[in-house]
Amino acid sequence: MWSTLDKTQKTVTIDAAPFNIKDKVGYMFGDIGNNFSFNVVNSFLMIFYTNVLGLTGAQVGILFLIARFVDAFADITVGRLVDNSKLHKSGRFKPWMSRMQYPLLIFLVLLFVPVVKDWALPVRLVFVFITYLGWGIFYSCVNIPYGSMAAAISSDPNDKTSLSTFRALGSALGSAITSYIIPLFIYIGATQKISGTRFFWVVVVCAFLGWGCYELTIHLTTERIRTEKSAKVPLSRLVQGMFENKALIVLVLIDIMIVINQNLSGTMISYLFNDYFKDKAAMSIALIFNFATVILLAPFSNFLTKRFGRKETSIVALLFGALMYCILLVVHTQSTSFYLIMLFFGSLGAGMFNLMVWAFITDVIDNHEVLTGVREDGIVYGVNSFARKVAQAIAGGFGGFMLTFIGYQSSTGGGAEQSVTVIHRIYNLATGIPTVCLSVAALLLLFFYPLNKKRVTENARKLEELHEENRVRKPSGKAWGSTKLAG
């Protein structure tokens, strides 16, 4: 284990206004802004590529697979670049957001340019590849600093819970707005044909709204914890520190299970209500649960964290969610109403962890500094983001494989009639996957994740003392945070 003092850096808490509602609301707008880009691309880019630009599903699939691989490594690279960048007067992370939001939003608009459909296929493919890859890289350049910034806004465990909760609210709001509003504007005529021109202008509006949200984040939040570095931490030493941080390794494994569950469950729910229950209205209700549970749980997250701890609350919630899905698996109900009720409670169990996941990451960042003496917000966040993208790629491939394995019949005519055996297998997958994933995540938290309530509080106290020791005062009596930094 390393010493808790490192000569190459100095971390302090600057003199600034106390953590307040401005920080919470400002941080929330950051993820609303992210979803004006990320959710628009995730939800609508494929249909734009296939129905407007005329690309085949195979061409789009190969593009997404290559880009996802590049994106995952971009997260780690950007995290390291951010950590080693100059400290500005507004902090280390906000300048990155301020600069990189512009190329991100420009590339977002370029993704949906309709005139590309008139170009030759090879030119179309090159343009699509360059713009999608560019969008992914610049999204990392905004999202990694944004996510890392939470640990720099406050070191107080309760404040971190608030930031995580407001970020989850922002994500839910941003996803809901883009998912349910955009389809109202992109179709024309009685046949509801997709309009490439309308698509383009809707995305331009989303880019403008995303810019406004990012600006609110930049101007409303304050980076209070700042690290001044005189030298870069060697990569070998950085990797060693990552492996010493057991909390990071375990959180990565837990996050992989949660993300796989989210992606596979979302896919299977669509097939379940389409083929097993044959109820499209119920499908819409089920898909809303992802947003609704976050909003319902948000008012209670801080109380539960203060009373029991982040780890402790999440273990109970995940086990509760797993139990609800397990009951559905065993009962094998044909009642849509009963399924929706149990699904709602199961979603509450998974939703509590999703509310707190960003606070878990800030706990891990603080733990990394306590263990190694080195504060690496960006790279720690980037490693976790890398794991989430790998999990998304696994879920994407595994979902298609499972449908083929159980004998699901595809169709070009609106949907083939599935056999009784196949639809019951769909039910088993829709309930069995979350039962297993949530149970494994809960057990990893219970037996291997070291940051319980007591440890988190102790780490916060140690870092507060260390940062106070590091505070350098000029002869005039001004605090280190008042000295001139890079503009």
Whereabouts are the PLM-identified features?
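Membrane-embedded alpha-helical bundles of multi-pass transporters/translocases
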Residues: 2-487
